[in-house]
Amino acid sequence: MKNRKGIILAGGSATRLYPITCAVSKQMLPVYDKPMIYYPLSALMMAGVREVLIISTPIHIDRFKELLGTGEDLGMKFEYKIQEKPVGLADAFILGEDFIGDDNVALILGDNLVYGSRIEEVLKAASKAETGGLIFGYQVADPRSYGVVEIDEKGNAISIEEKPENPKSDLAVPGIYFYDNRVIEIAKNIKPSERGELEITDVNKAYMNMGELRVIPLGKGYAWFDTGTPDRLSDASDFVKAIELRQGTQIACLEEYAFYNEWIGKEKVEKAIEKYKKTEYGKYLRRMLDRSEKPKYTEIYKSELFQ
């Protein structure tokens, strides 16, 4: 199976969050009890991606290096790249060309949070796609503020539009995308939009026009948050808080995913426990390590009952 690398786009000026983001990166803001970037990073980890490129602005890149380091503590490898100015999501593939090399790639936006009972299984399946492009569709009440995809009965994209006045479907496209290696050349050959950006919608259209853009609808039981406004950021924080306090769990616990993926051993988890010992995050890691294996009930969803 072809290797897949990951890119987290953590740039932009986040003017919709001013004055909060006047001096700090949006992706560093807390979503309840963790930095925002933990959530997209955990999604890549669930997909089985171990090599990740973080793209950010010249003034914020060092903060991400300080927060995340080399990835060694998670059994991963992190690289960093500066995006001098925001010129569109598709620019990530051009900036990341050397990093991607001959591999396939997943791009996730640094302000996106996805959650659901089977989300890990879904992301792993998406990451195994060898060719073409694969995106997700999430039902929303008012799709006019999003990229919108229309699909046929087999899950193939048949139309995709950016913030349409008259949407053809109610499926918004979350900010997580899986592509084969051709995405680099596709990104290089698309033309800037009227706002002067290389649009991810045009990348998706290129795959769709080749008949190679598949869509996985995320139905009931899944949550997706784009935390780009104060209200959405607050909603995401409230959601995470409710889940964690009610269930005694942690969403986007990086060491947990690394441990269960067998990328790190107990000694790395113990190191994190010592670092976070005064927090609920650290206490959760202690409980996880004492349990020492993934809860059996997480496998129930793979049984014939749920197929």
Residue ranges, per PLM feature:
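Glycine-rich beta-alpha junction loops
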Residues: 60, 112-114, 139-142, 164, ...
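A short acidic, often aromatic-flanked loop/helix-cap motif at beta-alpha or helix-coil junctions
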Residues: 81, 85-89, 142-143, 166, ...
